[in-house]
Amino acid sequence: MKTPGLRIRQPKARGEWAELRFITRAIELKFRVSKPWGETGPYDCIVDHRGRLSRVQVKCTCKKRLQSYVCSVSNNRGPYSPRDIDFVAALIIPTETWYLLPIAILGRSFDVWLTPQRKNSRYAEYQEAWHLLRR
């Protein structure tokens, strides 16, 4: 069965769906989540764990290239900066896999290649790494 996100064709609507999926999962894991008013800020959500706040930009992808999924970690102004966000939460829609990527590891990258089926892939340690939001 196809995951529901694959049926959403409009990119903005798909992004909103991914944000709701992120918020739902974070709440299930006992985080407090806040959603900023408006869409002009650099992050989509604020995750609170015992008073520690993390600014999270939610991204999603279903673009497969070779064995990996390509996910944008930038916006129309370029790569995100540690001044703007703390994490990119990337959802691979077909596999329903989350990556919690600290902004510090992304450098000036525009895209990341995520390979959930490979345990030794470049970003494997960030696959389902929700614990990073607890630090």
Where is each model-derived feature located?
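Mixed-charge (Asp/Glu-Lys/Arg
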Residues: 1-41, 46-135
